[in-house]
Structure formats: structure tokens, C-alpha cells
Amino acid sequence: MQISSRFCPILANILAHRREPDLIKYAHPNFSPFLHRTGIHSIQGVDDSLQLPFCRYFLFRVVTLMPSAQLEVAIQACRKAGNFINRESLDLSAIEAREKAPFDFVSRVDTGAQEHITSIIRQYFPKDSIVAEESGTIVNPGADGVWYVDPLDGTTNFLHGFPHYAVSIAYALKGRVMAAAVYDPVKDELFSAERSRGAFLNNARIRVSGRTDMSKALIGTGFPFRRNDNYETFLPKLERVARSCAGLRRAGSAALDLCYVACGRLDGYWEANLKSWDLAAGSLIVLEAGGLVTDLSAGEDYLATGGICVGTPKIFAPLLMKVTDANTGK
């Protein structure tokens, strides 16, 4: 539980000892212009049981910050798909995979997980569109809401028993990602975020690292793997970054790499030739954790271009300079 109050420490202390798991309580001013400087943040629902005399005396009221329906659905779908993936992982030898494109694999686990996800989304938001990796786009004309679904980001890792893969779901309204959830079923780690409400790992607030020196930064990336990918443009960027940072990691799941930047395990990350479902959830989680996000040309069209660069406020700029499409020198 968190209490936001600079003016009433007694109230904050009393309320902090009320055990309310999975809810975040805020005390915020109800009237006074002076107290209003503490700010009010997209708060819904008043908990009358916490209307203490202290609150009324100091012109405070206590409210509950509840997740949106979209985030609740994304989390529910992530967990259901993750449980399915965990069951299937008990016998990898029984899973057959096919190439949907050269070196790009899909299995019945991908399609099964996606069916779990889309059925939940359809149950609660039947009028929204869905952009999913294994089924393309399900379009509802006139729909403002769009769901980006990657049922198993890191399929190759999964098929080899390499424990680094995730379920990724994002909700966008009129082209702007508003809610996101990424679930690692191996570690039981749920990353989530809503726009202007912060980023969380298993209900605990997360922030990007405080790293400021590129020479001490740990950077993530993804190597080209498709037959027609251009190694000639990638390798100079890889060399520039490798020569300037403490270490490089290529773990094989863009969604988790982005979340690792958000929680401080990585200090930066870049990759090209991704799809919108790879990036939508993780990019919002990074932003809400205090990171910076652009495409590889320093623009904001990463969902469309498929290229992305993210990092801490101090690491982002030097990383982008080394991987930007405009930089062809060393």
C-alpha cells in the first residue's frame, strides 16, 4: 500500500497499516488549492471505509486506484495463456513445429495460447479489433480499440527448452497504446502498465535503472535471423555498441527484453524488423517506468516501422546515436 500525502503524515501512517493487497490507496486533497499541489492522478472509486476524521479535518479523502477493464482483461488473458504454455512445456518432444517463414517457427502451442487470449478478449470487448501474430488482423469496422497479441514471444526458445519467453498483450485506443501486460510463465513474472499510471512487476512499482555511463551499461538486442535480413547494415551497429558498453545480451524475446529495461535488468535495447505485436506492450511498460522510446530514426513510429530503441534517460541518447539508421560510420 502506498499513501501519497506530504501534509498529513499521521494519516499516512494510520492508513499504511491497513492491509489491502493488490490495491493502491492514495490520500489526496479534496478542496484546498494549496493542498492541490500534491496532484490528483486518474483516480477512480472512493473507499468509504477509509473516510476517517483525519481525512475530513485535513480536507483529504481516500480513494482507490483501480486498473482499467482493458488491463484486467489483458492480465487475465496473459495468465490463462501462460498456464496453457506451462502445461505444454512438460513434454516438448511431443510438440511439432512448422516454418511459417524461413527460420520463423510456429507450433500448436502458439495457436492454442492465442485461442485462449482471443476468446477472453472477444468475451469482454466483442467490438474491438485484434492484431495477432498467428491469425493476422481481425477487423471490426469503426472500432477505436485494437488489441495487439503475441501469444508466445520467443517460440524458438520455448521449443528448445530455453526458459525465456512470454505472452504479450496490449490495448490501443485510436492508435495510442493505453494498457499493456507481459507475462513470463517460467518465472511467474507479470509486467503491466497503463498510460500515466506507472509500470509494475507483480504489483510492485518498477523504474528503469539509474545508469548514466554507457561504458557500464548492459544492452539487449536481437540478431537478424530471417533469410533476407541485412547483416551488412546490422553488424556495424553491433560493433559500435559492443565497443562502448559493458556487455551485450541477445535473449530471444523482444517483449521480455523491453520489460527488462523497464525494471532495470537491462539499461538499453534496440532491434529492427519487429512486428507491432512484439513491441506494443513492452514499449508502454518502458515509457511508464521512466524510459525513453523511439524508432531507429528517432521518431515515434516504432509500431509501424518495426525498429525500436529504448533506454534510461542517460543511456538512450548514446545508444541511439550508435544504432540509428542515419549513422553509417563508426
Where are the language model's segments positioned?
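N-terminal subdomain of lithium-sensitive/metallo-dependent phosphomonoesterases centered on the IMPase/IPPase/PAP
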Residues: 60-152, 314, 321, 328-330
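Residue-level signal for inorganic ion chemistry
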Residues: 85, 110, 121, 155, ...
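Hydrophobic alpha-helical signal/anchor motif
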Residues: 14, 24, 40-46
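An extended, acidic
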Residues: 207-330
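DPxDG-like acidic metal-binding loop motif
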Residues: 141-200, 215
